């Protein structure tokens, strides 16, 4: 019967697959469609009810029929035996047993169950059938019927016929171990391919038998719940044996074997093998069926419920009986049969191979995919490779969706656990379960491209393994048969031939590895693998599966060692194997690669040496098989053999916690299981030695290794953070690379940056230390869309932040050092053929040691001069973009970077970007005005550029660069001119720049660093926030503080007191030098009477925190709603209030002293300015009044108070007081310097104390935690003149701090009050900084507003103040400030400058400076001040030289000139002051600082004020 059915179904051993398929399809059509319905229902029922006995009669009944009838009958009988037979019938009909097997797997657990039942029953059947071919053949039909409806529907009857036959042959390894004549590898491949076809075929056929299948599934699901589990246990044993046999058959890949062997040697060998097996199986059927039913249910139940179930199943492989004897013997007989059949028939035991091949071939096929083994073992061997499992999953899911089980076990790993649970449920419910399980991994695998590739590799590997197995089968077949016989006899465990074993092992090992992973996850809960193994033994099915794997391993062992030790050793191996497989699989699965194998080997080896027991060999084999699946199977087999030997030495892996890093102790496994559940999916992590590399597999370090301190920047693909390395305590910058919104994975800019920075190693180029992630696990990373972090060395500042802050003044030597380092780094890049393409001030980093580093290589690219390919011209920030890019050049050269560096050189001198436009056309226009219009006369190739005709300037300009930047030192100007050549071919190179006179002999290492703000890291982001806050009219305390550095005290205080005074801050910065003029201001106008002053003091003292709005109310100051809101946000800290009295008083004393000094008040007012900008205007007015009276009343107190406040660190006042130490050289200059000092102190002290008084620290943007220490330079520059006046004032008044703030406000307010209001309007219009009209009016409006640069409003409106200024000498200063802000203002002032510095004491100068500062305070950076740089009158410089002498007295006017602008040009021309005003582009606060410096009297403040505010 079997042979006839096989022949009929298979079309004869010699028939080609296509022919066999056709025949099988025809037969199926004829017999399956009519017979299947009755057979399926009755077969299923009998199978469930009478597992062993009914099948034989049915088989016999099936046998008598014609080949087709026999096939149908066999299907019926086998179906009676188990759900499997129908599949076998299909296989016979299709002649595609492998495909059938795969289809069965796909079809679901039922298919597997049926196969198992067939196996279990076919064991007895062999004798009954004699060949068992009929049973296997018959089994095909039920398989079709039992297959999921989806699978059936998918497989048409036609497709189902051929592919089902193929599947039947494949699945029913017994029914013609080779469904096709093709070699096992070919069969397996076909099986895989055919399995897919069969899926469709079966789907179509199942479409016909959908109802039947559904009914059968339902019945199976119900009965199969119990019986199916029994049959599964049988299947688990017999099925696994079949699977092994199928593996052997498929691996032997002798289709003839399956067919002819099934017919001939099948009957003989199968009878021989089956006889022992039959007796055993009969015993099992009578005894085992119940136990199988009992045990399989347990295994299934336990497996379903617990991971242990898998282990139990594995164990139950050996336990299959108490069935160890019967199952083991069964297995042994099966393995012997498999081995025998392979050797005799060359195809393996045909009947057994059919049975074994049927279930085994499905298994092997399923396993061949690499998921199959594990899944098949755990799921009764039905688990098919991922491909199959996917189809079976779907099918079984739709009818019997074992989703519940799947979900239950999916926990371990959705794919693996689901496989197990699904395979179990599907064993019961449908054959597809094995496929199901495979599918779950495959689906999971397929979810990622990596998984898909791995899946492909698995299939290819399985095919290769099958081929290798086939090749080895012939040689090993005999050995395997003998070894199998010996092993079967000795161990009474069925082991497939080594070829089969290895083919199946390799294929199923992959599956097994995955299954093992599942098992690990599931088993992990059990503390000891041994216990788990015992449980597995208790569960027959898993043991069967495990036994298969073990048998495969054992077969290899047998081949190597001849025979494994006994059933005990086998069972031990099985137990160990599942455990080690589980353990190893976890790591192996992740590391399904050579590393895994090596690691496993190493781990196992390390563990093995102490463990001499050979039983471990199966595990090793499995591990090896897994590894083999991964690597070349021949190599894998050898490795596996070696591992096996090592494993044989190893005792139970569970007991050996150290045995495997990969396979840890059960408890460790549990943890590992959980960890591995996460780690297994680690797609990104190293796949090898997952456990071994636990700590390093996902990356040695995670972002958790850093303490993130704050954000310091925003890049193109994420934020930049300042962080501290927890291990080394080193400061680093973390550049975040977010993958969230990245459509194409990792950002190309980040890839380029990483790639390029790894090739650039230079002291002037930022160093990338490492790359870390924000996830410790690849699974989490994939799930949550993690981020990468590029770890760079930390740099304290960038040039943009420093220039805009106004806190630093760079002299010519500093600029030389910076440019030397910059050009060295750029020359290095260009010599390495890299273009940076994004050089700008914010990408030039600076640390506190004065080291310059080029950063942000996200736009950089490799450059090839020989290469003519075009590059994008949309590179380089617009302000630094060279004319060739603006005109559309795409074949540019490194000259583009040199242009950017030339822009930076000019910016270092002018303190502001030299070409500021917001559109390309406007940018080109600006360049043309300074550098001349691009024309063929100067730039012959310009006519070739794409946009030359469309973008050329409307009018022709001549080159005026040297005239515009005449204030730059000659050597620097030469280089500047050379670097800004329009024609890129005439532009200097980085190397030539290093050889120019300006940079030739510069040694940056020997040059002292500039006086950098150690209390504040000045970065672009900080600077932008600061500027934004000022524009919003809010006090940017931090910014103010920094600005104060530029502004020194005034800028800081202004910002703090009322950012609205943003103008004031600028003026404050200047006023530091000009603060002398401020006192007069305070006088005018709003002076608080004693009662008002008392109220103010009481207010300050009485409240723990004072709201600026309250201040305004108390002072009866009118404020607009916007300013009011800003003021409401501003609270003075209790500390400030505590010193509030002092502050208020000191302010008054300061004001008083300032008034006498004439320059102190402005500085003091400036200091109050540090308060919120919005509040500043209002507060300034209020303070102006308060300070006026306070100053009058308490000049002497002021000095004391200021000193006290300095000590107390109370706000603006204290810093001012600190400044006092340097006493004014002259009342005017002294006051001016003192004011500057006070401003400095305010900046330094104010950051903490003053600001708190004026603004709560929380409201201030980043500020130095402590007030910046007073720098001698700054103090001297700003305070020399101011020293004495401020000191005495502040010392005298206990409220000096408050008074200083008030004085500053008053100084601004009063001067602003008279002219202020005029100017205030302008200021308000021009600048958002001005919250209060007073402040705005004062000077702020014009100087702060961008207008200052552009408009004379500040000065014009200040023109009224200039009167005051003149009286204070502030007029000249104002003009100088105005020069910064506007040329017109200078015009008024230039005559006065001399008078200003001379006739007007520092106070006047200070006031003027305040005005000037206010101007610079304007964010000139917001405007294009390039063309206004000539505004500044030289007179201001000259004037300022006197007053500025205080601050700059230390630095002669020349030094001032060195202050970049005015050093050369401020004195020389108003342009210098204009430049100084331009400085304000950086920020109002900055402007003031520089403005003071730029003012002649305060060179430091002027330098700072001009920093960027310098017009040019």
UniProtKB/Swiss-Prot annotation:
Record: active site: 838
Modification type N6-acetyllysine: residues: 557
SUPFAM superfamilies linked: Protein kinase-like (PK-like) (SSF56112)
Modified residues (Phosphoserine): 316, 318, 326, 341, 343, 359, 361, 384, 396, 398, 401, 438, 440, 526, 1049
Biased composition (Pro residues): 49-58, 1254-1270
Residues involved in ATP binding: 712-720, 735
Compositionally biased spans, kind Basic residues: 92-109, 210-220, 419-436
Bias type Basic and acidic residues, positions: 189-198, 295-309, 512-523, 567-586, 661-671, 1044-1056, 1201-1210, 1311-1320
Biased composition range(s): Polar residues: 492-511, 1057-1077, 1145-1154, 1369-1387
Intracellular or extracellular location(s): Nucleus speckle
Phosphothreonine: modified positions: 589, 872, 1059, 1246
EC number of this enzyme: 2.7.11.22, 2.7.11.23
GO MF entries: ATP binding; cyclin binding; cyclin-dependent protein serine/threonine kinase activity; protein serine kinase activity; RNA polymerase II CTD heptapeptide repeat kinase activity
Start-end of Gly residues biased regions: 129-140
Enzyme class at the top of the EC tree: transferase
Covalent cross-link Glycyl lysine isopeptide (Lys-Gly) (interchain with G-Cter in SUMO2) as placed by the record, residue numbers: 520, 548
Domain Protein kinase: 706-999
GO cellular component entries: cyclin/CDK positive transcription elongation factor complex; nuclear cyclin-dependent protein kinase holoenzyme complex; nuclear speck; nucleus
The reaction(s) this protein catalyses: [DNA-directed RNA polymerase] + ATP = phospho-[DNA-directed RNA polymerase] + ADP + H(+); L-seryl-[protein] + ATP = O-phospho-L-seryl-[protein] + ADP + H(+); L-threonyl-[protein] + ATP = O-phospho-L-threonyl-[protein] + ADP + H(+)
Compositionally biased residues, Low complexity: 160-171, 246-269, 350-374, 384-402, 463-491
InterPro entries xrefs: CDK, Kinase-like_dom_sf, Prot_kinase_dom, Protein_kinase_ATP_BS, Ser/Thr_kinase_AS
GO biological process, one term: hemopoiesis
Quaternary state and interactors: Interacts with CCNK, CCNL1 and CCNL2. Interacts with C1QBP.
Family to which this protein belongs: Belongs to the protein kinase superfamily. CMGC Ser/Thr protein kinase family. CDC2/CDKX subfamily.
Described purpose of this protein according to its UniProt entry: Cyclin-dependent kinase which displays CTD kinase activity and is required for RNA splicing. Has CTD kinase activity by hyperphosphorylating the C-terminal heptapeptide repeat domain (CTD) of the largest RNA polymerase II subunit RPB1, thereby acting as a key regulator of transcription elongation. Required for RNA splicing, probably by phosphorylating SRSF1/SF2. Required during hematopoiesis.
Protein's recorded name: Cyclin-dependent kinase 13
Organism: Bos taurus
């Amino acid at each position: 019967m079997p042979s006839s059915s096989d022949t009929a179904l298979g079309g004869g051993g010699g028939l080609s697959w296509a022919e066999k398929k056709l025949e099988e399809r025809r037969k199926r059509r004829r017999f399956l469609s009519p017979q299947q319905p009755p057979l399926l229902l009755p077969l299923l029922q009998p199978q469930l009810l009478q597992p062993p006995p009914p099948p034989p009669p049915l088989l016999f009944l099936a046998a008598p029929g014609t080949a087709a009838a026999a096939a149908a009958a066999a299907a019926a009988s086998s179906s009676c035996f188990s759900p499997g037979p129908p599949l076998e019938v299909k296989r016979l009909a299709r002649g595609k047993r492998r495909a059938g097997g795969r289809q069965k797997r796909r079809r679901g657990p039922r298919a597997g169950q049926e196969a198992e039942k067939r196996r279990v029953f076919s064991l007895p059947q062999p004798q009954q059938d004699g060949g068992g071919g009929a049973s296997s053949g018959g089994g095909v039909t039920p398989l079709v019927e039992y297959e999921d409806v989806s699978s059936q529907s998918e497989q048409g009857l036609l497709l189902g016929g051929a592919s089902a036959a193929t599947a039947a042959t494949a699945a029913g390894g017994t029914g013609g171990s080779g469904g096709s004549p093709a070699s096992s590898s070919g069969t397996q491949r076909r099986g895989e391919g055919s399995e897919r076809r069969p899926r469709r075929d079966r789907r179509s056929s199942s479409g016909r038998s959908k109802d039947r299948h559904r009914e059968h599934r339902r019945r199976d699901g119900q009965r199969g719940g119990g019986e199916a589990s029994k049959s599964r246990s049988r299947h688990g044993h017999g099925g696994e044996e079949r699977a092994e046999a199928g593996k052997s058959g498929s691996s032997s890949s002798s289709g003839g074997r399956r067919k002819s062997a099934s017919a001939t040697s099948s009957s003989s060998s199968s009878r021989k093998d089956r006889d022992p097996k039959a007796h055993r199986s009969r015993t099992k059927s009578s005894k085992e069926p119940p136990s199988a039913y009992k045990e399989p249910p347990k295994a299934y139940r336990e497996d379903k419920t617990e991971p242990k179930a898998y282990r139990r199943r594995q164990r139950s492989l050996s336990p299959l009986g108490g069935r160890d004897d019967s199952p083991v013997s069964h297995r042994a007989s099966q393995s012997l049969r498999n081995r025998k059949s392979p050797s005799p028939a060359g195809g393996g035991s045909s009947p057994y191979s059919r049975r074994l091949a049927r279930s085994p071939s499905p298994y092997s096929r399923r396993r061949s995919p690499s998921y199959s083994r594990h899944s098949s073992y755990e799921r009764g061997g039905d688990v098919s490779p991922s491909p199959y499992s996917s189809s079976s999953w779907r099918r079984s899911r739709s009818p019997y969706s074992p989703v519940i089980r799947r979900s239950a076990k999916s926990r371990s790993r959705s794919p693996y656990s689901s496989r197990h649970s699904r395979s179990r449920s599907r064993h019961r419910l449908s054959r597809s379960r094995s496929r199901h399980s495979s599918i779950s991994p495959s689906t999971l695998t397929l979810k990622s491209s990596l998984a898909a590739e791995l899946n492909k590799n698995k299939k290819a590997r399985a095919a290769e393994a099958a081929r290798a197995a086939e090749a080895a089968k012939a040689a090993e077949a005999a050995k395997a048969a003998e070894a199998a016989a010996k092993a079967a006899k000795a161990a009474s465990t069925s082991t497939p031939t080594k070829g089969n074993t290895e083919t199946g092992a390799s294929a199923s090992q992959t599956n097994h590895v995955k299954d093992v992973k599942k098992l690990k996850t599931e088993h992990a809960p059990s503390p000891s693998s041994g216990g788990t193994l015992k449980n597995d033994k208790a569960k027959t099915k898993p043991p069967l599966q495990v036994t298969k794997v073990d048998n495969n391993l054992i077969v290899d062992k047998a081949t190597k060692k001849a025979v494994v030790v006994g059933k005990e050793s086998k069972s031990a191996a099985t137990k160990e194997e599942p455990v080690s497989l589980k353990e190893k699989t976890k790591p192996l699965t992740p590391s399904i690669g050579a590393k895994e194998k090596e690691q496993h080997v190493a781990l196992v080896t390390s563990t093995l040496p102490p463990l001499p027991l050979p039983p471990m060999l199966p595990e090793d084999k499995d591990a090896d098989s897994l590894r083999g699946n991964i690597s070349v199977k021949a190599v894998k087999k050898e490795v596996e053999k070696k591992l096996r030997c090592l494993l044989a030495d190893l005792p139970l892996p569970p007991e050996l916690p150290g045995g495997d890093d990969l396979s840890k102790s059960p408890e460790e496994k549990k943890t590992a299981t959980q960890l591995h559940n996460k780690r297994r999916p680690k797609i990104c992590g190293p796949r090898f030695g997952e456990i071994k590399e636990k700590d390093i597999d996902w990356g040695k370090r995670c972002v958790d290794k850093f303490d993130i301190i704050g954000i310091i920047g925003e890049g193109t693909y994420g934020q930049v953070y300042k962080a501290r390395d927890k291990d080394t305590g080193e400061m680093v910058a973390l550049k975040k690379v977010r993958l969230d919104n990245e459509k194409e994975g990792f950002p190309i800019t980040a890839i380029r940056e990483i790639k390029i920075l790894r090739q650039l190693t230079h002291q002037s180029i930022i160093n990338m230390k490492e790359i870390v992630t924000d996830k410790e696990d690849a699974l989490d990373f994939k799930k949550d869309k993690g981020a990468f972090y590029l770890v760079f060395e930390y740099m304290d500042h960038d040039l943009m932040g420093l220039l805009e802050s106004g806190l630093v003044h760079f002299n010519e030597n500093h600029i030389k050092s910076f440019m030397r380092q910059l050009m060295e780094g750029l020359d290095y890049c260009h010599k390495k053929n890299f273009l940076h393409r994004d050089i700008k001030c914010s990408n030039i980093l600076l640390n506190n040691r004065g080291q310059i580093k080029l950063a942000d290589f996200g736009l950089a690219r490799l450059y090839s001069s020989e290469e003519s390919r075009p590059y994008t011209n949309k590179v380089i920030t617009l302000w630094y973009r060279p004319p060739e890019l603006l005109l559309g050049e795409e074949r540019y050269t490194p000259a583009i970077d040199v242009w950017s560096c030339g822009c930076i050189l000019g910016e270092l001198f002018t303190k502001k970007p030299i070409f500021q436009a917001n559109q390309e056309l406007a940018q080109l226009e600006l360049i043309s005005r300074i550098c001349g219009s691009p024309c063929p006369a100067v730039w012959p190739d310009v006519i070739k550029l794409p946009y030359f005709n469309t973008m050329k300037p409307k009018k022709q300009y001549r080159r005026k660069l040297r005239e515009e930047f005449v204030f730059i030192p000659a050597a620097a100007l030469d280089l500047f001119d050379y670097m800004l050549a329009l024609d890129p071919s005439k532009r200097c190179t980085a190397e030539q720049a290093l050889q120019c006179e300006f940079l030739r002999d510069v040694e940056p290492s020997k040059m002292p660093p500039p006086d950098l703000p150690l209390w504040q890291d000045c970065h672009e982001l900080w600077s932008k926030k600061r500027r934004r806050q000022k524009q919003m009219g809010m006090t940017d305390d931090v910014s103010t503080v920094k600005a104060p550095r530029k502004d020194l005290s005034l800028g800081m205080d202004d910002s703090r007191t009322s950012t609205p005074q943003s103008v004031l801050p600028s003026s404050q910065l200047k006023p530091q030098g000009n603060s002398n003029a401020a006192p007069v201001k305070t006088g005018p106008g709003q002076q608080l009477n004693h009662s008002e002053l008392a109220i103010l003091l009481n207010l300050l003292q009485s409240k723990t925190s004072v709201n600026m709005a309250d201040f305004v109310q108390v002072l009866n100051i009118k404020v607009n709603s916007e300013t009011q809101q800003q003021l409401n946000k501003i609270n003075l800290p209790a500390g400030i209030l505590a010193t509030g009295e002092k502050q208020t008083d000191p302010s008054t004393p300061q004001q008083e002293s300032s008034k006498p000094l004439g320059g102190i008040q402005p500085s003091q007012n400036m200091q109050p300015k540090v308060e919120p900008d919005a509040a500043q205007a209002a507060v300034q007015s209020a303070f102006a009044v308060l300070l006026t009276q306070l100053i009058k009343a308490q000049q002497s107190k002021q000095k004391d108070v200021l000193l006290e406040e300095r000590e107390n660190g109370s706000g603006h006042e204290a810093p001012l007081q600190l400044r006092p130490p340097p006493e004014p050289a002259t009342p005017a200059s002294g006051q001016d310097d003192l004011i500057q000092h006070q401003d400095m102190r305010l900046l330094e002290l104010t950051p903490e104390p003053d600001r708190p008084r004026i603004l709560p620290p929380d409201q201030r943007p980043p500020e130095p935690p402590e007030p910046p220490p007073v720098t001698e330079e700054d103090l001297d520059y700003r305070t020399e003149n101011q020293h004495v006046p401020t000191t005495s004032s502040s010392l005298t008044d206990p409220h000096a701090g408050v008074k200083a703030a008030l004085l500053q406000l008053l100084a601004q307010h009063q001067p602003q009050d008279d002219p202020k209001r005029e100017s205030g309007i302008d200021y308000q219009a021009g600048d958002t900084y001005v919250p209060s009209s007073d402040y705005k009016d004062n000077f702020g409006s014009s100087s702060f507003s961008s207008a200052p640069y552009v408009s004379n409003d500040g000065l014009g409106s200040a023109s009224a103040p200039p009167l005051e200024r003149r009286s204070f000498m502030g007029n000249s200063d104002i003009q100088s400030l105005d020069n910064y802000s506007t040329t017109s203002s200078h015009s008024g002032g230039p005559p006065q400058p001399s008078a200003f510095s001379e006739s007007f004491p520092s106070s006047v100068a200070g006031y003027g400076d305040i005005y000037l500062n206010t101007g610079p305070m304007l964010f000139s950076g917001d405007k294009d001040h390039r063309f206004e740089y000539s505004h500044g009158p030289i007179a201001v410089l000259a004037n300022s030289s006197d007053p500025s002498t205080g601050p700059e007295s230390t630095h002669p006017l020349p030094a001032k000139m060195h202050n970049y602008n005015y050093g050369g040009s401020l004195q020389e021309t108003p342009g210098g002051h204009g430049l100084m005003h331009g400085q304000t582009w950086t920020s109002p606060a900055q402007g003031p600082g520089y403005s003071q410096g730029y003012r002649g009297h305060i060179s430091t403040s002027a330098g700072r004020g001009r920093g960027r505010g310098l017009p040019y």
